[in-house]
Amino acid sequence: MPEPAHPKNHYDSLKREVDGYIKYSHTWSIVWANVYYLLRVTLIVLAACVAAKDSLPRIASVAAVLSLLVAVGTALDTWLKTGNRYRGHYTFNDKFIALYTDLELTDATDTEKVNNLELEFKKMIGDYSVAVLPE
């Protein structure tokens, strides 16, 4: 029969897992921030061009295409919920960092505290999935 896991191994394993989520959420917050802001700026510029089509003769000839691009871009932004995904990733990145800090300040042999932090982490993972995945 194998020996029960040493508290330090459980502690280190939990720290590695939380650290992995910190890196993951940070990476995806950057990705979704870029998608969100690039799409928003593009939509604003294209919509402004469509609105100014009467004053800008060169744009008048492609106004219908620009209007279509604005409609498609807006639909994609709404469907993908880029803002919600971006906010979800950066919000949970902060939460994972706070949990990691709590873990760092906890003695590895304090099994009860480590187990409580693990339960908190598991709940956080479920909440994280809900926050960043579109409905």
Predicted segments with their positions:
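Conserved non-transmembrane functional hotspots
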Residues: 1-62, 66, 72-135
